[in-house]
Amino acid sequence: EDIVSDYFKDTFADKEVSYKKKAGEYTENNPVYILYADDKKIANVTLTEKKKNAHKFTEWKLASIDFNVDSKTKNTEHSVKITAPKNSEVTINGVKVSSDYITGEADVSLCKHVGDYVTTPVDDVYNINGMFAKPEVKVTYNGKELDTEYVKDGYEAYYPSDDELLSSEKSHILTVAENYGKYMINRGSLSTLSSYMIGNAKEYMSDIPAIDVYLIGRTFTYDITDENVSNFRKYSDDCYSCDVDYNLNVKWSSGSTTYNISLTYVFVKQNDKWMLADFSIR
């Protein structure tokens, strides 16, 4: 009831309400009108005869109101697209969404290069048409409510975190990230860094030049501060992703600079060992 109430408050607030006969459907015996708020179509209103009054004039009563005006035209602002991890439970305004609304699958974009090693994580894509109010979307996965946000073309629910796995892997994640930074300033080796990698990550790393030209010929020291691992997502028992951020501080005799390192990692488990399968620089 609150959803409907809020919808009408938003729809008619500070608007001029008007109506017109609906061409092609209006007749003297079956009046049909289009209701407007300013220039926006809100509803089709159909009247039916209630009775004849003492003067033989017809008194009318409401027969029906159709609020799906927009969904019958090219306006689709009340359609809802939801992307959620496969086998999730999706609810809209507290009502469970049937699997009948699943229109397809989509690979998780971060994990598009892991298929040679593990099963590629996928999302279910839901499309629900004919909504006349902004929905409240909730997604649960294995009993855990997921982070869900509105993106450019609909709602997206993200795979859950796993505190236990993050705790056991955090040191490993930071070791890989620190070795990346050391390699970039020529204080680490490509062979050491590559030993943590497979697949696309290993190929990508081999194409990145080692040292910033700004440091060539300089004698310098360095340290790493403000390390942080965030957006940890577990897709399965053998695949996860995360963001890694830290500052790589470099000092030399006459100055200093700080490199703000921001990476997104995708790890897969191979032979009981977590390997970096893909990464991107943010």
Language-model regions, residue ranges each:
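A broad structural signal for short, well-ordered beta-strand segments within beta-sheet-rich domains
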Residues: 62, 219-225, 276
